[in-house]
Amino acid sequence: EREQARIRREKVGFVFQIFHLVPRLTAAENIALPLTLAGVNHEEREQRVAEVLASLNLSDRAHHRPAQLSGGQRQRVAIARAVVTRPVLLLCDEPTGNLDHASGIDVINILEQLNAQGITLLLVTHDQELGNRANRIIHMLDGKVQP
């Protein structure tokens, strides 16, 4: 059980449909949270947070709280928090489900860039456009994988 927890903490990132950002923390503090919990030193934490903020075009929003961000910006903060630990696998549950079309396309493009950088993505979605861009599609019906 400890080994499974370590693998989840170090190798897997999670992106949820509902962003699960801490309302009292800034975008940068939300992104830094898993690094803080992992005991990463302050200097490295600041550097990695700055890198992911820049890569997701959020540098100008670093000191904003979630309530001050748009839905697309909140989802990008959630993605940044998931990838700041440099996972090999990113699990995404309806990553575009609560977004307008334009923000959804931005998130899809970000996920494709992460995949091109070597992160394996496992997405759960009802979004046909997102599904059509996947390398492999597995359909489920009533909780069962379809042939």
Predicted regions and their residues:
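Conserved switch/coupling elements of ABC/ABC-like ATPase nucleotide-binding domains
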Residues: 142-147
